[in-house]
Amino acid sequence: MADRDRSYRTFDQVVRGDRTNYQSGPSTTQVLTVLTLLPIGGTLLALAGLTLTGTVIGLCMATPLFVIFSPVLVPAAIAVFMAVAGFLSSGAFGLTGLSSLSYVFNRFRQATGTEQLDADRAKRGMQDMVGYVGQKTKETGQTIENKAHEGGRT
């Protein structure tokens, strides 16, 4: 049995039939892709290394200053944080108060029925405006017509 050479079919041969797909190497597109991206990737990696180095050096130089000035910096940071939180919360409370007053005012208007009067007044105003625009349109049309007749006479 050991003297007999068995031929095993590969996965590609099973899937594609008995056709074998011989490739001698990477395609031209793959080679160009690698040649294009290798310098770009190397440059970006070098820039990342320089950035990391600069950050570590800056941190090493600034750490003693942070330790020395921490009795001043920490309370100052806390004070700034509390001031910003105070301004933001006062703004939120103001908006909440305005929306509450608006809600109460609208509920009061609905209860007294004054909103129907406001709606009727708005309808009359719109009707008056439509009538005014219609009248102005007629006047403008007559003016243009008169000018056209005058231009035709001369």
UniProtKB/Swiss-Prot annotation:
Upper lineage: Eukaryota, Viridiplantae, Streptophyta, Embryophyta, Tracheophyta
Keyword Membrane included in the entry's annotation: yes
N-acetylalanine carried by residues: 2
Region (Hydrophobic), start-end ranges: 34-105
Transmembrane residue ranges: 31-51, 65-85, 86-106
Predominant place of localization: other
Pfam families in UniProt: Oleosin (PF01277)
Keyword annotations of the record: Acetylation, Lipid droplet, Membrane, Transmembrane, Transmembrane helix
Role played: May have a structural role to stabilize the lipid body during desiccation of the seed by preventing coalescence of the oil. Probably interacts with both lipid and phospholipid moieties of lipid bodies. May also provide recognition signals for specific lipase anchorage in lipolysis during seedling growth.
Domain of life: Eukaryota
InterPro entries: Oleosin (IPR000136)
Identification of the protein by name: Oleosin 16.4 kDa
Membrane-protein topology: Multi-pass membrane protein
Gene responsible for this protein: MATP7
Cell compartment(s), UniProt: Lipid droplet; Membrane
GO biological process: lipid storage; response to freezing; seed oilbody biogenesis
Entry keyword Amino-acid biosynthesis: no
